[in-house]
């Protein structure tokens, strides 16, 4: 029998410039959602958020942002005193975004306001409220735990994408990966 060692939170990945912070995960989730809309994915539901662009006028508005897919320089456009096209698109998406997970909304808002988030801390805070505060968003911990599982699944998918795009395949050892990912 082989013992497993899993290093969590050692900072090695961040020290080497890998986008593996929780804030990176939230930004990655939002980018994927926004790119999906630009690519014609008018409906999305994953348990964390949902977007439905069904109104023909909204779809026309969305079409006006399609050029961003082809033009990598749009990020650098700065109109003094005006909202940039990227900011206009962010507002458009925000107007159509519905948080299906209160917990995911909480961590998204933390990233927006503080530029970082402590998912474990936010979870623990909400878990304590379940038992202490009658006006808590959650009646019992079951829904909160289910939402945590959805977030863990999305985070795992994001980290696999980071591994695929940022870590050279010759540096990965399939035997170690199998040991890490086995139950």
Each PLM stretch: what is its role?
Residues 1-183:
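Gly/serine-rich nucleotide phosphate-binding loop at the start of the catalytic core
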